């Protein structure tokens, strides 16, 4: 089924509305509310939220192809404003959503389930699980099916997405901040790191990487996928597993310093090229990736 932008935007609005209600009423989600929260797909394929949408007159500044999304985008802004304590918080929520547009492409459940199933088939039963770019926790759900007693630490930088994640997994450590905020005591801590990590030439500043004697670690800060890979390797214990979906640039780049650093820290078990239309239905994007 093709990516339906209007339906995805509607799903996102209802999930955000539900999260605000749960916050306001200070309670856990019902089964029906969990289903609404789980339909949230992020805004990676919904660049319409970058357009002005505070007033009805803003419609004249929208492209004709996007006009069907104008009314729900106005509704989204109204919903966020009505549930913000002041204009500053409203702006923080909106700016955070807009910043996520470049990286918030969520993974089909069939893929996360398959990866979790393969790990289980090889008797990987992690007690401590890291998800460094969680979205609403599709990977978390998949791996917990096989390891229901595991402790999970997940990171989600976007404020509203992080709120939804927290309501979906109230008994786990869901952190609404960037992965670079993970503390040093969690180095060599996790049995498994699993994620569809963000990718692109987005820089990440990490003081530990900046001070490193390794050129590969310092240069990894220049591309977010390289940074996440090395930071994930740092967090996993000896004998642990990193299972990431990532950009083809990790293996195809002509610059080898980051790759050399990865192979210095870990052994490659498997690499699989995924079809470039795999994420079309979920995020409206085409990209060659690896896991």
Ranges and model annotations:
Residues 147, 171-172, 209-213, 259-262:
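Glycine-rich, phosphate-binding/catalytic loops in enzymes
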Residues 155-159, 220-278:
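Conserved Class I SAM-dependent methyltransferase catalytic core
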Residues 184-186, 281-285:
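Short glycine-biased active-site loop of nucleotidyltransferases that positions the nucleotide triphosphate
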Residues 112-145, 154, 177-212, 226, ...:
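Conserved proline-anchored active-site loop of SAM-dependent methyltransferases
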Residues 2-168, 172:
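Class I S-adenosyl-L-methionine
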Residues 288-291:
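Conserved small/polar residues in nucleotide/adenosyl-binding loops
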Residues 216-217:
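Long, Pro/Ser/Thr-rich low-complexity/intrinsically disordered regulatory tracts in eukaryotic proteins
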Residues 175-179, 272-273:
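Short loop/edge segments at beta-strand edges and connector loops
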